């Protein structure tokens, strides 16, 4: 009896308790749970958990209110169980999200003016790599950047191991003129003295690539090219475990494997991936193996605070086929006359993010990062027209250790104006500081005389050529402000203050050689120590006017600066001589453009620009000598036109069509010349590695499951040095680079949501061409691009 009464009492109390509680679930428009939604009823509050569930004490009010910083406020009638879906908040400050949603089919677009702790105005682009078609495993840059005007591409390898891209007449060498970042932090070797990027994230791991130029790029650095930020896919939000595997086979013995796991468990989210690339290469002596690893763990402390820890690791070994002379290239571009050259890179990056949503208007972010990496080039570095007779090889070792932290604060505000006839002034203010410190050690000496990948000095304590340490420190303060006046006018300003201190300490050796017998008469060690600090203030401003809801005119101006690189001032290279008075570069960029959706099926992005490049560093024949000299050639002026247009023909006739047939044209014309120089014969000469006309176009057909694309790429001929030499030098370091065109074909079919196949042919017509003449590694000489190649990719996805 007592037991029965206890059960009745328990049931009664339970029912009474649950009758006093409102429960339910909150989801977005795609039925994904939303974490951190505030649920309110008079004085009682609750927050949704990671499954979107909530329990709220019942009150006497008739309505329950749901609020979240990223979603529209919603009030519903109070009931015992409430399940709701919230709409994403779209304000006038970030209304370009509307455009981006409409641009999903175009795989390209531009960034909202305000997002997170970032302001993006002027020329900028976002490449939606998740939706992009092409050879993702090998990272074909022609397909990746097909819709970004004005980019010149170096093709040093056919596997996407290193990226060489430059915009608006800037050098493509390892993308050194871009501030290269991943998830907002640095990935280059040394941000100050050696900003070359040996590491490129796998395209299969990316959600997008952000490119910001103009005044808004000052928040990231001083580079002429602006920012290029690789955005890794976020961990999946709606599953504790997801597994994706992509396996690719291709021509020249290529195999690529990409495996990723991801998930979220309550407040914890995670992802880990590994990528393998290996192959024999298009040319003889060009086999390679690369491993990449990435791990990310994120934890929500509460609905406003989030921590993320990331590790990136990469290792690759590549045999270097070396360069070719012009005669060799015409005979057989696949041949190699170097079989003892090797290249190795180890890359390790650790990063920590902290995000704090202070309020619906203000956000704070701190990102700290550190890197410990190394690169080794081993081989015979003599001129390519000299035979390798098997003597001791040269080894250049670079070790990079750096660390930094960047803090950003962004707040949105409204200025109430007294005059009723004048609309309020709305805006967003971003400010931040950055500290960076790094040390690069560069050593050059003799190594073994065999053909193995043996990265060891013969005399590590008495190097035959040079040994240097390059410490550097950098403090930066930056601010950006954007005003929205009325419904159409936007004005922004940016300022960056840089303090840079760089130094060098070490030695190099000079050899006295007998002019007839070539015997060594003496060796002289020269100790070299320098220290230089400088303050660099930079300014930028921009304006935009909305010609319609989905189109705008914009203009921008900003100052730029580039510090002398370590490799600019000290490397023993038999092919070039370094000017001892070489100095930093400076300049400015001005642009005017028009972009947007003219119609739902027609997107365009047009721009004209003027880039002034003062004290430009380049390669020229040495006066009264036979060598090439790296020096400040003079002042250059780059002016150009960039145009991109894409149209979906089927959508033009039927907006609700299930099929898509689109074509795009990407055209740029760049006129880059030296306008001042200490060498009179350089004035009026074209700037090296600037292709005056670049054209990329493509045709794509797409259904729900199937898509296919044909793409055409053309580059007009360009010079490789400031003297504009047409006839090649005997070592092929200097000479004209002829025009070339390439076609790429790809297709994709999705059998199910969990399985898809991709295939394609790169360089469909088997064109024989090259994009650069290398002065040293991986040459020297002509570096042929890959011929026709095939690939097949199978993707499988499992989701728990």
Explain the meaning of each model-derived region.
Residues 208, 215-217, 227-263, 274, ...:
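Short strand-turn segments of transmembrane beta-barrel domains in outer membranes
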Residues 300, 312, 398, 555, ...:
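Conserved C-terminal beta-signal and adjacent last beta-strands/turns
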Residues 302, 421-428, 434-436, 468-612, ...:
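Structural signature of Gram-negative outer-membrane beta-barrels, strongest in the C-terminal barrel
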Residues 353-357, 363-379, 546, 552-558, ...:
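Membrane-embedded beta-barrel scaffold of Gram-negative outer-membrane proteins
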Residues 410-416, 487, 499, 605-613, ...:
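Gram-negative outer-membrane beta-barrel transporters
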């Amino acid at each position: 009896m007592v037991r029965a009464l206890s059960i009745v009492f328990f049931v009664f109390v339970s029912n009474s308790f649950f009758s006093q509680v409102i429960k339910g679930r909150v989801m977005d428009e795609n039925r994904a749970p939303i974490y951190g939604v505030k649920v309110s009823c008079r004085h009682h509050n609750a927050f949704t958990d990671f499954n979107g569930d909530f329990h709220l004490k019942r009150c006497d009010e008739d309505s329950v209110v749901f609020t979240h910083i990223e979603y529209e406020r919603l009030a519903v009638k109070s009931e015992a169980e409430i399940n709701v879906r919230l709409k994403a908040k779209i304000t006038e400050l970030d209304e370009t999200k509307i455009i981006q949603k409409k641009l999903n089919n175009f795989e390209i677009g531009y960034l909202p003016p305000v997002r997170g702790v970032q302001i993006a105005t002027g020329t900028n682009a976002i490449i939606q790599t998740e939706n992009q078609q092409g050879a993702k495993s090998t990272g074909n840059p022609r397909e990746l950047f097909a819709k970004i005007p004005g980019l010149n591409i170096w093709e040093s390898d056919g596997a996407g191991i290193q990226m060489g891209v430059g915009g608006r007449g800037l050098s493509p060498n390892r993308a050194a003129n871009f501030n290269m970042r991943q998830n907002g932090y640095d990935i280059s070797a040394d941000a100050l003295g050696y900003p070359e990027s040996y590491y490129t994230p796998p395209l299969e791991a990316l959600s997008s690539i952000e490119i910001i130029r103009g005044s808004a790029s000052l928040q990231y650095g001083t580079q002429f090219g602006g920012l290029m930020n690789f955005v890794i896919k976020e961990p999946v939000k709606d599953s504790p475990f997801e597994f994706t595997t992509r396996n690719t086979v291709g021509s020249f013995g290529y195999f690529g494997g990409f495996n990723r796991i991801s998930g979220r468990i309550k407040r914890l989210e995670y992802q880990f991936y590994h990528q393998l690339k290996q192959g024999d290469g298009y040319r003889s002596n060009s086999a390679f193996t690369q491993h990449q690893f990435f791990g990310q763990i994120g934890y929500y402390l509460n609905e406003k605070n989030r921590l993320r820890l990331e590790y990136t690791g990469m290792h690759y070994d590549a045999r270097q086929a070396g360069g070719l002379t012009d005669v060799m290239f015409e005979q057989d571009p696949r041949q190699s006359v170097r079989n003892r050259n090797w290249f190795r890179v180890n890359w390790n990056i650790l990063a920590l993010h902290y995000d704090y949503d202070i309020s619906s208007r203000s956000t704070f972010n701190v990102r700290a990062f550190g890197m410990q990496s190394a690169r080794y080039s081993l081989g015979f570095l003599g001129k390519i027209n000299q035979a390798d007779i098997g003597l001791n090889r040269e080894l250049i070792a670079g070790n990079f250790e750096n660390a930094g932290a960047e803090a950003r604060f962004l707040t949105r505000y409204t200025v109430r104006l007294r005059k009723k006839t004048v609309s309020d002034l709305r805006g967003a203010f971003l400010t931040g500081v950055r500290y960076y410190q790094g040390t690069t050690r560069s050593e050059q000496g003799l190594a073994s005389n065999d053909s193995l990948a043996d990265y060891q000095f013969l005399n590590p304590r008495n190097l035959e050529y040079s040994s240097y340490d390059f410490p550097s420190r950098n403090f930066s303060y930056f601010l950006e402000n954007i005003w929205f006046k009325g419904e159409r006018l936007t004005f922004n300003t940016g300022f960056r203050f840089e303090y840079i201190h760089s130094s060098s300490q070490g030695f190099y050796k000079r050899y006295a050689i007998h002019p007839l017998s070539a015997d060594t008469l003496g060796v002289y060690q020269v100790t070299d120590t320098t220290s230089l600090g400088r303050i660099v203030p930079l300014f930028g401003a921009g304006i935009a006017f909305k010609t319609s809801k989905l189109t705008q005119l914009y203009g921008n101006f900003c100052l730029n600066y580039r510090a002398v690189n370590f490799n600019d001032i000290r490397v023993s290279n038999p092919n070039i001589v370094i000017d001892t008075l070489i100095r930093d570069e400076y300049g400015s960029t001005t642009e005017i453009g028009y972009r947007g959706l003219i119609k739902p099926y027609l997107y365009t992005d047009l721009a004209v620009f003027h880039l002034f490049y003062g004290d430009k560093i380049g390669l020229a024949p040495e006066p009264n000598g036979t060598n090439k000299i790296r020096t400040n050639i003079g002042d250059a002026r780059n002016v150009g036109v960039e145009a991109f247009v894409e149209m979906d023909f089927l959508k033009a006739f039927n907006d609700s069509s299930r099929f898509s047939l689109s074509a795009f044209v990407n055209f740029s014309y760049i006129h880059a010349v030296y306008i001042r120089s200490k060498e009179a014969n350089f004035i009026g000469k074209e700037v090296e590695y600037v292709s005056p006309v670049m054209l990329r176009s493509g045709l794509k057909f797409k259904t729900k499951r199937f898509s296919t694309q044909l793409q055409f790429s053309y580059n007009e001929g360009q010079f490789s040095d400031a003297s504009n030499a047409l006839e090649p030098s005997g070592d092929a370091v200097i000479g004209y680079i002829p025009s070339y065109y390439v076609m790429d074909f790809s297709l994709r079919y999705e059998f199910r949501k969990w399985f898809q196949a991709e295939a394609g042919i790169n360089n469909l017509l088997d064109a024989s061409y090259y994009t650069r003449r290398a002065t040293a590694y991986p040459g020297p000489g002509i570096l042929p691009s890959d011929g026709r190649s095939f690939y097949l990719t199978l993707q499988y996805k499992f989701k728990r």
